[in-house]
């Protein structure tokens, strides 16, 4: 199969994630349910140590193939599958924030995201402040010394506001903060998140 694919969405969807030679022939990557793996030699096992290809809890060839496809569609450097969209949001925020940090969250956010911020994050000493999703460059006035993340949704979860992403990105990056997007509605086919200045793009892929 040639790697010279066009940028047409249907072509990208068809070809993405198919470079993994571990499928041994099937057109579609097979579903791997195994948690334990065999290695041809102890040298191979040692070489794999530290990678995710040592135990099913870290992922299987099936999940890694899907991650690869999502990376290709989104133009991302790397990708991690989680059990749900909310787990992707919580994993990201817990990785980027620590006690004493400030999070600027779009007031149009998904309700379970708000519950996460007002519940678990608050108990961990992480402050969340909600901003008008139409604020644009005015977000600069809300940034504090401890603001680490500005979170947007593309588009607003229930009310569908469209954020001025380049303006938000410019303000956040000038401050040293990251811009994180819930891209569930937009999808990689609907916008180029990273070209617009997004640092981390999340999806509830089941949508």
Task: Give residue spans per PLM region.
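Conserved PLP-enzyme active-site core in the AAT-like
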Residues: 2-5, 19, 80-207
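Residue-level signal for pocket-adjacent positions within structured domains
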Residues: 8-9, 28, 50-53, 203
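Short conserved active-site loop signatures built around small residues
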Residues: 2-32
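Histidine- and aromatic-rich ligand-binding microenvironments
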Residues: 28-43, 132-134
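Conserved N-terminal alpha-helix of the aminotransferase class I/II PLP-enzyme fold
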Residues: 36-90, 113-119
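Short, hydrophobic/aliphatic alpha-helical segments
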Residues: 7-13, 68-72, 198-199
């Amino acid at each position: 199969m040639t790697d010279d694919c066009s940028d047409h969405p249907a072509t990208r969807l068809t070809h993405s994630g198919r470079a993994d030679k571990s499928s041994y022939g099937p057109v579609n990557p097979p579903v791997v349910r195994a948690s334990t793996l065999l290695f041809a030699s102890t040298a191979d096992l040692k070489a794999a140590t530290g990678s995710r290809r040592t135990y099913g809890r870290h992922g299987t060839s099936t999940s890694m193939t899907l991650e690869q496809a999502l990376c290709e569609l989104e133009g991302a450097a790397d990708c991690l599958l989680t059990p749900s969209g909310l787990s992707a949001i919580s994993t990201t925020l817990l990785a980027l924030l620590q006690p004493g940090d400030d999070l600027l969250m779009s007031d149009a956010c998904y309700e379970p995201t708000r519950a996460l911020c007002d519940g678990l994050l608050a108990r961990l000493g992480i402050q969340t402040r909600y901003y008008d999703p139409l604020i644009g460059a005015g977000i600069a006035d809300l940034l504090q010394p401890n603001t680490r993340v500005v979170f947007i949704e593309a588009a607003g979860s229930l009310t569908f506001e469209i954020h001025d992403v380049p303006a938000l990105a410019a303000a956040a990056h000038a401050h040293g903060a990251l811009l994180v997007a819930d891209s569930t509605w937009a999808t990689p086919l609907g916008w180029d998140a990273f070209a617009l200045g997004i640092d981390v793009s999340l999806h509830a892929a089941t949508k």
